[in-house]
């Protein structure tokens, strides 16, 4: 999550905070972001500004990248082979202001020349002067909590899906607008999405540049509100429109400059030092950890130079930067390689961080380069975040660009182009990261039979409890998990309701869903409510299911449509998970479950499926178009003992 400085324009007097939102006019408010500079020096200020909420659950205990505690603080120690060269020269960089006149006669610009002779197009001091607030420790938290305590609505847009089976965490999909209600913790914020309030990872969202007065329910899908918001924005007062467009342009320019500094620090602060220590790192290890980030750095430098040429410093709202994105849209494809490599980089880095020698080395690199207090894995996440931010920034810029503006058509085309790039990369990343959780889920199921779930599936679409009706009219309560290509049936343990037993599966490629109207079914001679059928294409065998509520049935019907659509999209895009990654995921899951206590018949006891350990980034692949059903929270329906014991010994109709 990139922090933000906050600037406000003139405002009218209003009633005390919280008394009359309609009477106060305090717009536009700009939240212009850069990079996280969290610290502990202003924690008390943050707490004082925070509006005390109602009783809330504790902040989730697990860490959320990029703020994982993998870097140990350096204590004085003797220099060794794991100490980066030049650590004894740590101090303020020697600054030289040089005048560079561009070939087209542009204005002078400052360059930063460090002790190694490398040159950058802007200096750290210039960044501080341009954005004094967000470069200060705790600047973003102070800015957000000031707005919240003043009664303002603060909204953020989701960069990625956040799917969770934890009631205390907020689930959302990429592009959703989330109202931020508390930002006292640097990793987890409290927010509202639709009608639910819970914790969510701060690094998963981007604050809106222009915080406008929104309806009480600020959360909505980005795609659904885009046209409506754009239409409203274009009817605003011209001066307000220009100011808001200026805010977005400045955010794009400022975040791009800070991003370049991050890339430079990674390449010069980490990679350069690692290559000098051949005894610690192999070429293959460095390729795994850093991927093609040096190529990204070269590309982004050229992209920023072109942006600077199109940037109008005197009147930023007149800047025409859309053409820059269109000219470089093919170059952004290099991010796909980096994002696909990123999960492997996290694994390799995590293995190295188990050794104190590497922890000290990477921390020394950070100190030598005078980088902000974020661990290396946090810096390596920034390219993944950046490529997902471009569509959100361009969407907001388009919102405040009139159709008469010279850059309107280019911005619109650039938004569509970058959205497609980000969607493809995000989808590939979600697929890779989902397989670990699916593997752990399978290991937790008692009595699993047949092929591994990953042999055919890579995505959990939906899950929930259904009643399966047999031809004899008997009911069987089962929990179903719908993956791409297959539907898995499980049964709860009679005594331990958190334990699941494998009962069978169905091939979704070989069945069709048929909706059943409420009333008496002639084929089954039963009165049915909230029912649907799965009919085999080959044998015409029919499986009848009933949901508890009409809403549950609607979710299953939508989930079936989503499953078919996702399978087709994967085939069109050639989306396949490498076999070696599937095998590695299963191997890691089996190792994690090895040695646990045994249950009935020496079967491993399954942990509660609702509390499976979270994945890196926690944006696994439950479908984004439907809410996840909390199946573990459902009450067990009452059944007559005689029916239960009569059917206890019978096999499920599902084919194993």
From Swiss-Prot:
The keyword Kinase does not apply. One of its GO terms (molecular function) is guanyl-nucleotide exchange factor activity. The keyword Kinase does not apply. One of its GO terms (biological process) is cell migration. Residues 565-656 are annotated as: C-terminal tail. The modification Phosphoserine is found at residues 82, 118. Its main location: cytoplasm. Residues 244-428 form the DH domain. Residues 102-154 are annotated as: ABR (APC-binding region) domain. Residues 151-210 form the SH3 domain. Both the ABR and the SH3 domains contribute to maintaining the protein in an inhibited conformation by associating with the C-terminal tail. Binding of these domains to the C-terminal tail inhibits the activity of the protein by blocking a region that is required for its GEF activity. This is Spermatogenesis-associated protein 13. It comes from Mus musculus (Mouse). The lineage of its organism: Eukaryota, Metazoa, Chordata, Craniata, Vertebrata.
